[in-house]
Amino acid sequence: MTVRKVVATAVLVALVSLVLNNAAAFTPNWVYQTLEDGRRRSVGLWWACWLVERPRGAPGPGARPGPADVRDCEALGWGSEAAGFQESRGTVKLQFDMMRACNLVATAALAAGQLTFVLGLTGLPLLSPDAQCWEEAMAAAFQLASFVLVIGLVTFYRIGPYTSLSWSCYLNIGACLLATLAAAMLIWNVLHRREDCTAPRVIVISRSLTARFRRGLDNDYVESPC
């Protein structure tokens, strides 16, 4: 039993979205913050690291690498106010808490879509590739991931003067777009199949309607391609 190319492509796109979503979540590069004293740090959903500028030139003889050569990172969690720092702590805390929740829900939804695809390949009755609910379940999961990522990303439309968005945020935007594309491909495939199969499986042709036009017609029905 072959799987449609559109479905396989959509699942592959969703898999890339899942990888990008997790990469954006666990890298401390969601935003950059600059303090008044000139120090800078990168803040992610779960980590915040100080950006240490190494002095130019080679170290002297016998010098040992100190703490300044290592990124000083701290873990962040739910309700952490350390992400705000010089910005409004309440606003930044809400932004990161919302994004953490949306990121986790999107990860679960994308993983559920991948699991649905794998279970369908095993030949389960309710999730077989011939059943429409198989594609609809995957489309719903990918659309949910896209929806919650949009909600989380919208919270960062306004940031403080000491903060600038970094590449992890744009990586998550790419994950959101790919999840939307995967859902759109599956929805298009489901609607296209329904348009092809809107007619009943058996079309009954009355003899009285066709007798005057085709005298030699002996068939009582014609099967549709669906």
Swiss-Prot record:
UniProt membrane topology term: Multi-pass membrane protein
Transmembrane helix recorded as keyword: yes
Gene3D superfamilies: 1.20.140.150
Signal peptide: none
Localization: Cell junction, Adherens junction; Cell membrane
GO biological process: lymph vessel development; regulation of vascular endothelial growth factor receptor signaling pathway; smooth muscle cell differentiation
Major subcellular site: other
Superkingdom per UniProt: Eukaryota
A cellular-component GO term for this protein: adherens junction
Keywords linked to the UniProt accession: Cell junction, Cell membrane, Membrane, Transmembrane, Transmembrane helix
Extracellular side: 27-103, 158-170
InterPro entries, per the entry: TMEM204
Ranges of the Cytoplasmic topological domain: 1-5, 125-136, 192-226
Parts of the chain that traverse the membrane: 6-26, 104-124, 137-157, 171-191
Function: Can influence paracellular permeability. Appears to be involved in cell-cell interactions through adherens.
Name this polypeptide is given: Transmembrane protein 204
Originating species: Bos taurus (Bovine)
